[in-house]
Amino acid sequence: MSYELVVGLEVHCQLNTNSKAFCGCSTEFGKPANTNVCPVCLALPGALPVLNRRVVEDAVKLGLATDCTVARQSILARKNYFYPDLPKGYQISQFEEPICSEGMVFVDTDEGRKNIRLVRIHIEEDAGKSIHDIGDDTFIDVNRCGVPLLEIVSYPDIRSAGEASSYLQKLRQIIKYLGISDGNMEEGSLRCDANVSVRLTGAEEYGTRTEIKNMNSFKNVEKAIEYEAKRHIDVLENGGTIFQETRLWDADRQETRSMRGKEFAHDYRYFPDPDLVPIEVDEEMLDRLKQELPELPEVRAERFVRETGIPAYDAGVLTSEREVADYFEKVVRACGDAKAASNWVMGEVLRTLKEKNIPVALFSVSPERLGGLLNLIGKGTISTTIAKQVFERMLETGDDAAAIVEKEGLAQISDTTEIETLVQDIIEANPGQVEQYRSGKTRIFGFFVGQCMKAMKGKANPVVVNEILKQKLDG
């Protein structure tokens, strides 16, 4: 029998607001335990929440960017459950009336582009943190209580672990483009739970699902889903039953393990929070936020192809991060050569960022300076080979390319008389290779080019060298 994998993802995105969702406490990470707190965080009697306007705006922006319907009125609800690091005994969330619903995210698969539908995007607050690694005691840190989250829930449209990873990466890309979160999975700014089930191929009814937690990287998301799908199939093939439960992914043992029985929505006894008025999104706010939306990656990539003529693949790489796309456009403005800018940003710049493990914001070579380097190549002042040496010197010194070229005498030699004399010397010094070339072994032409470039320490203009060599050898 063959089975079909069915996956839906619940993604929690921690917003990068300065203050919490329902009070004015700081959201700064890494502060001493229980210092970013107030009576609202601690659920002291009489403390009342006040919704952070920025949280609403970020939710609407994400909804607009994913083609959701934005509710003009939505309700904040209490999700009731006990957890030691949840002082109130409930979490402020949304249930029946979320702020955004029925959206979509496109992903590229082996079969082409696919639309993953979104059920909803809703606002909620984070819980605190239990600390178990200090002696035999457990401590509670409520600094994180009330930090704003957006939960993005997909329909069960995902059919492979690879699709799940692609969807998550595309969603993260959109979130980062909007600037509402850094989307860092390793640090918990982006968290993903996967609802996994299998069914016989061609069946319409879904199988029993399990929820997988504790996946802190794209690779772990793929591995956990693949493992859980195989576990489901093995259980069913052996006549067993899949139970609805929550399971944890153990990255060390590369397996999922049971955590608890999976709750149903009605177990949480959701009801509207009486301390918070409904969220109103009026026409003026909606129009303003639409105007504030940045150009999203797919649209930007299409524009790059249309306006600059670079290949679609290049455009996709360059728009993978908003800051890289911004850098590329500034380089193009500085040098006027989009293809050269694309090659250098995708090559030397991204290589350096990866080696140094830094974002483009901390890159020491400004786009204007890189554009200056490319101008020197375009004018024939230096060769591409020398340009790479100059680039390394720019990284080390912070100097402009032109200053480095002048100071170190790296300018390309294009003087035909000087090059012609050198070429003649090399031809006379290698009669055997000349005879091979003239007998039809033209591939040896590269040998002569190499000898010329070596003699002039890479500074000879390769175009001039090729022209003169051709004339001399064919003459």
From Swiss-Prot:
The keyword Protein biosynthesis applies. Its EC number is 6.3.5.-. PROSITE patterns: GATB. GO terms for molecular function: asparaginyl-tRNA synthase (glutamine-hydrolyzing) activity; ATP binding; glutaminyl-tRNA synthase (glutamine-hydrolyzing) activity. The keyword ATP-binding applies. Keywords: ATP-binding, Ligase, Nucleotide-binding, Protein biosynthesis. GO terms for biological process: glutaminyl-tRNAGln biosynthesis via transamidation; translation. It catalyses: L-glutamyl-tRNA(Gln) + L-glutamine + ATP + H2O = L-glutaminyl-tRNA(Gln) + L-glutamate + ADP + phosphate + H(+); L-aspartyl-tRNA(Asn) + L-glutamine + ATP + H2O = L-asparaginyl-tRNA(Asn) + L-glutamate + ADP + phosphate + 2 H(+). Belongs to the GatB/GatE family. GatB subfamily. Heterotrimer of A, B and C subunits. HAMAP family: GatB. Allows the formation of correctly charged Asn-tRNA(Asn) or Gln-tRNA(Gln) through the transamidation of misacylated Asp-tRNA(Asn) or Glu-tRNA(Gln) in organisms which lack either or both of asparaginyl-tRNA or glutaminyl-tRNA synthetases. The reaction takes place in the presence of glutamine and ATP through an activated phospho-Asp-tRNA(Asn) or phospho-Glu-tRNA(Gln). This is Aspartyl/glutamyl-tRNA(Asn/Gln) amidotransferase subunit B. It comes from Chlorobium phaeobacteroides (strain BS1). The lineage of its organism: Bacteria, Pseudomonadati, Chlorobiota, Chlorobiia, Chlorobiales. The gene is gatB.
